[in-house]
Amino acid sequence: MTKRTVIIGVGGPVGSGKTLLLERLTRRMSDLNLAVITNDIYTKEDALFLAKNSSLDEDRIIGVETGGCPHTAIREDASMNFEAIETLQERFNHDLDVIFLESGGDNLAATFSPDLVDFTIYIIDVAQGEKIPRKAGQGMIKSDLFLINKTDLAPYVGANLDRMREDTLHFRNEDSFIFTNLNNDDNVKEVEEWIRKNFLLEDL
């Protein structure tokens, strides 16, 4: 019987922390059979970072060069990512527990095709501005889990985290977003536990 692999999309603007999030999560979730697909426009930079820094072997990481608009590769024409998923499935005999699929850095409106992924995480960072949650981008609104990263930078960029929380609560439930600082692992455990409970249904 073929195992049901959960595909988790990870989206967010350039520099928000998508790749670092995957590096942290794959280390913490090493009890599972994991693989990662990264999307970059013209390089495989994120895949190379994970191959060097994560706990995954290189054959568990595929870098997709999307060219053009990264949004298209996760929604309108996701053929390259479908192909990468199938490659990983065949490589590991359809026995993977989770495939994380990281989008290329894109704008606040970027969303994944529901045919491509089962669940989505969208991540922004405080340095992009306190007003980002107020902009109500579809990536934030439609994702299953929303992360606000780099909380340590708030005093330096004049961002009020309480205001960001209030603005986020206009669009999301309290239990579906988490503040993080991935550089020092703040709340990474909470993100992992949220994924295990809500995406992998481990508590059922």
Swiss-Prot record:
Whichever gene encodes this chain, its name is ureG
UniProt KW Nucleotide-binding keyword: yes
Taken from the record, one Pfam family name reads: cobW
Q: Which family is this sequence assigned to?
A: Belongs to the SIMIBI class G3E GTPase family. UreG subfamily.
Q: Report the protein name in the record.
A: Urease accessory protein UreG
> Taking the first listed entry, what is the main subcellular location of this protein, grouped into a coarse class?
cytoplasm
Can you cite an annotated GO cellular component? Answer: cytoplasm
Any one GO MF annotation of this record: GTP binding
Query: What do we know about how this protein assembles, alone or with others?
Result: Homodimer. UreD, UreF and UreG form a complex that acts as a GTP-hydrolysis-dependent molecular chaperone, activating the urease apoprotein by helping to assemble the nickel containing metallocenter of UreC. The UreE protein probably delivers the nickel.
Write out the GO biological process terms: urea catabolic process
InterPro entries recorded: CobW/HypB/UreG_nucleotide-bd, P-loop_NTPase, UreG
**Record localization:** Cytoplasm
What the protein does?
A: Facilitates the functional incorporation of the urease nickel metallocenter. This process requires GTP hydrolysis, probably effectuated by UreG.
Where GTP is bound, by residue? Answer: 12-19
- What PANTHER family does the annotation carry? UREASE ACCESSORY PROTEIN G (PTHR31715:SF0)
Q: Which superkingdom? A: Bacteria
What lineage, starting at the top, does this entry show? Bacteria, Bacillati, Bacillota, Bacilli, Lactobacillales
Which UniProt keywords are present, listed alphabetically? Chaperone, Cytoplasm, GTP-binding, Nickel insertion, Nucleotide-binding
